[in-house]
């Protein structure tokens, strides 16, 4: 009882005098809910941990939680209407004893239950996280290690990948130099007879990789890795390099070269010789010849070449122009540097095709021809010379027959060079020799398994053969390697249109990031739109915006619409304008090839100086897209 003159407020008074939250507290509803949730949590963890032991399906735990969630409101209602009394469970309305001591004792018991259930749940959680998960991870790692070991057992012993040499110079901008040395080492090692050498594009995927040597070796399909670092300071260079076994990371050979910078070419040659000796492989000659080095031995020219090559690969108009300027500086230092004349020719072609139109494009092509002629005069027997000549003939002169002859010569001179293989496969593809092209692309992938453009080219060859499922698989593999690589979603649009899948065509067209191919892909997707007004509008809009510069792609849209008269009219325009796309797609394009039995197709091939394709479509395919 309170003191005289004061009012005692009791929270245990009659129910009608309490608010809803006080009533929930009085009836221990909060505590009952906490016990229920804790028990469900603990039991669900227990079921999840024991289910694999009894080979129970995965849905057991999920449905247990769902059932408990459904039962939760009933439990709350039960705890509201019933209470525990000295005589047992009773309806709240039937209990008139108001034994406050027992009521408080019940609350304390529920508190202990809550603590116990939560503690048990936490123990299960810790067990699952730190014990079972660790064991599962160990088991998974053991499985992965077994799989990797099995894959490495299949690769040839005489195989190597050159990982990008780490740049340890104070200036991070010197990375182009360490990358250049890595790339030149790859080029040098391709001259070793009987040695499988992984191309730069795939090897460089593992820059700063945390993967183990075994994982890298399995991914690239090689038994050995070359890794190391480059430190340049002033006029001195230190190159530390080692050859290791992929299977266990043990060293086969290692050495550190600390030399004047002017001796960098000799260092590269020594490394190649040492690797060949360590693997017991004979060289094609007495020593490795570094054919892409400046004939004058000018180190400044070499460094500028590496810098320019790295910048051009950024692929923007500004970077290509900057690279061209650097190449021109190189040629002022060493006018007889044939390799750089070739780089200048290629960069000029790319500048004209990708970024210029009209007279500016033609001037870029003229510059490319002049540079290619210089290269041909200085290094007529270099593989890269014939690759560059073929590229010029294919892209600028629309001469795929002449280009293929050059690519074959380059491949004969450098049979292990992945770039030469890739260009030869492309040359075969451009002339409709798709089976041979597909076979060579697969061989190229074996030497450069992570190079995305090879997969993209392979997909186009498969499209020409109407192998739609395989073309889609290869394209999606390329997307895994480089999701933003140009043209991949356009490939998927073509596949969808050939299948008549309008929804997939529309979805993939919106994902194509290349501005030229993206506009074409969106227009192509509309051509199978049931709304013909939209299809017509898309075609008119594309012709208005792109028809002048992309006549071949306009012809392609008409082919997809099954309008051969307009298709041949635009194909003639493409040939007359020497549209670079004409020679690269005419004999592989599934939409155009649907009309290869039309006499106008044979006449066009004769006019362009290319043979009829050596593959034939099925009757269904030949009837049109």
Each model region followed by its residue ranges:
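Phosphate/oxyanion-binding loops and surfaces in catalytic or ligand/nucleic-acid-binding neighborhoods
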Residues: 70-73, 80-87, 192, 246, ...
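Long, low-complexity intrinsically disordered segments that are proline/alanine-rich
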Residues: 2, 6, 141-147, 622-623
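Alpha-helical protein-protein interaction modules
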Residues: 387, 402-408, 418-424, 428-625
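Alpha-helix N-cap/N′ positions at the starts of helices
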Residues: 15, 299-307, 367, 518, ...
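Acidic, proline/glycine-rich low-complexity intrinsically disordered segments
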Residues: 50-53, 106, 111-492, 496, ...
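An N-terminal, helix-rich hydrophobic module
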Residues: 2-135, 250
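Acidic-histidine catalytic/liganding microenvironments
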Residues: 27, 192, 334, 589-592, ...
């Amino acid at each position: 009882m309170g003191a005289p003159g004061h009012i005692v407020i009791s929270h245990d008074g009659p129910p009608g005098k309490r608010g809803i939250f006080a009533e929930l507290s009085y009836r221990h509803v909060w505590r009952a809910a906490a016990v229920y949730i804790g028990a469900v949590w603990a039991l669900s963890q227990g079921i999840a941990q024991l289910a694999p032991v009894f080979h129970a399906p995965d849905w057991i735990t999920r449905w247990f939680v769902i059932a408990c969630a459904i039962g939760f409101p009933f439990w709350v209602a039960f705890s509201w209407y019933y209470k525990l009394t000295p005589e047992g469970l009773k309806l709240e309305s039937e209990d008139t004893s108001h034994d406050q001591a027992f009521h408080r004792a019940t609350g304390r018991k529920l508190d202990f239950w809550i603590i116990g259930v939560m503690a048990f749940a936490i123990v299960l959680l810790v067990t699952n996280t730190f014990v079972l998960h660790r064991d599962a991870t160990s088991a998974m790692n053991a499985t992965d290690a077994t799989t990797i070991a099995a894959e490495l057992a299949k690769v040839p012993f005489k195989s190597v990948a050159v990982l990008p040499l780490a740049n340890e110079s104070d200036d991070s901008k010197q990375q182009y130099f360490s990358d250049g040395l890595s790339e030149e080492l790859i080029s040098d090692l391709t001259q070793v007879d009987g040695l499988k050498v992984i191309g730069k594009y795939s090897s460089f995927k593992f820059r700063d990789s945390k993967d183990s040597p075994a994982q890298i070796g399995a991914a690239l399909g090689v038994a050995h890795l070359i890794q190391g670092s480059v430190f340049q300071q002033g006029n001195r260079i230190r190159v530390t390099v080692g050859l290791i076994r992929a299977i266990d990371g043990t060293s086969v050979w290692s050495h550190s070269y600390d030399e004047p910078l002017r001796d960098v070419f000799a260092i590269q040659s020594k490394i190649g010789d040492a690797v060949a000796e360590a693997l017991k492989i004979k060289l094609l000659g007495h020593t490795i010849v570094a054919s892409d080095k400046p004939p004058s031995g000018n180190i400044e020219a070499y460094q500028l070449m590496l810098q320019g090559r790295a910048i051009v690969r950024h692929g923007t108009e500004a970077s290509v122009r900057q690279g061209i300027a650097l190449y021109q500086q190189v040629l002022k230092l060493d006018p007889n540097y044939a390799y750089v004349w070739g780089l200048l020719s290629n960069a000029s072609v790319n500048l004209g095709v990708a970024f210029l139109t009209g007279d500016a494009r033609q001037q870029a092509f003229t510059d490319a021809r002049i540079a290619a002629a210089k290269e041909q005069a200085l290094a007529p027997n270099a593989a890269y010379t014939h690759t560059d000549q073929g590229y010029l003939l294919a892209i600028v002169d629309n001469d795929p027959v002449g280009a293929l002859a050059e690519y074959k010569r380059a491949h004969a001179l450098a049979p292990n060079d992945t770039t030469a293989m890739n260009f030869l496969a492309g040359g075969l593809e451009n002339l409709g020799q798709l089976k041979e092209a597909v076979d060579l692309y697969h061989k190229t992938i074996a030497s450069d398994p992570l190079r995305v453009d090879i997969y993209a080219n392979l997909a186009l060859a498969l499209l020409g053969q109407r192998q739609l499922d395989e073309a889609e698989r290869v394209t999606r593999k390329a997307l895994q390697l480089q999701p933003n690589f140009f043209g991949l979603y356009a490939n998927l649009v073509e596949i969808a249109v050939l299948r008549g899948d309008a929804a997939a065509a529309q979805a993939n067209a919106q994902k194509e990031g290349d501005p030229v191919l993206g506009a074409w892909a969106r227009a192509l997707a509309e051509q199978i739109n049931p709304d013909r007004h939209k299809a017509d509008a898309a075609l008119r809009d594309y012709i208005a915006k792109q028809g002048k510069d992309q006549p071949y792609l306009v012809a392609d849209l008409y082919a997809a619409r099954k309008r051969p008269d307009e298709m041949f009219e635009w194909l003639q325009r493409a040939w007359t304008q020497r549209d670079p796309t004409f020679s690269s797609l005419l004999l592989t394009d599934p939409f155009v090839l649907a009309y290869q039995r039309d006499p106008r197709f044979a006449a066009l091939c004769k006019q362009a100086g290319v043979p009829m394709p050596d593959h034939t479509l099925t009757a269904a395919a030949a009837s049109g897209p």
